[in-house]
Amino acid sequence: GPLFAGLFNTVDGYDTHAKVPDYFNAVNKNALDAGKISIIASGWDPGLFSINRLYAEAILPVGNTYTFWGKGISQGHSDAIRRVKGVKDAKQYTIPVENAVEAVKRGDMPDFTTGEMHKRECFVVVEDGADKKRIEHEIKMMPDYFSDYDTEVHFITEEELKKNHSGMPHGGLVIHYGKTGLKKSHNHMIEYKLELDSNPDFTANVLIAFARAAYRLNQEGVSGAKTVVDIAPAYLSTKSADEIRKSII
């Protein structure tokens, strides 16, 4: 990221939330020195979900924001399972906990622990003679991936994995529940939802839209690192400003 930012206008889907500030600073320095623009973390989370969290919190500052991911395949978690000795292939689904979603929509404003919002479901193909009990234990106890979650492990054949789990679906929800009024007696909910047949296809389209914005902004002389919330929506569109005013506003 930082290397290419010093050479070209760039757009990326950097997705490690906790490291975004440091990544931004590294990219920003090189992009500014080169007179280039780099739009970082511009997938759907971080990305589109970031925009919706910001809008919701700006409009309803008294409230709580909740982000649920899934149901969908997590590529990182699937890779982690494949690294377990004896595993031939695997897919892992991240699934929102329905009771948690319902509690948020009721306006309970709950404080969740890590494992209370999502559960993990794993479909695993093992090598001949592999110890399934050991593999299941290693998966469920894996720190940072599964140990904090309700995790189910299903052992299936390679044919079943290819037939039933070959796609790359994903999605999620951003829900903001807020209150207004002198006595905070008026309740409001903002919800943004994605249901994706193909996570890679959708993410690529998001990146293309922000590439359009990067080109336009650089033509105006803008340089340095930007996040998705720094970009005015009109820069993403294929339509002219006049067309936007006629058909969207």
Segments from the language model and where they lie:
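Rossmann-fold NAD(P)-binding glycine/threonine-rich loop
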Residues: 13-38
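Glycine- and other small-residue-rich loops at beta-strand/loop junctions that grip anionic moieties
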Residues: 13-16, 20, 41-42, 66-70, ...
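A generic structural signal for well-ordered alpha-helical segments
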Residues: 3-4, 27, 31, 82
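NAD(P)-dependent Rossmann-like dehydrogenase/reductase catalytic/cofactor-binding core
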Residues: 188-249
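Rossmann-fold NAD(P) dinucleotide-binding segment
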Residues: 1-13
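Rossmann-like dinucleotide-binding core of oxidoreductases
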Residues: 34-99
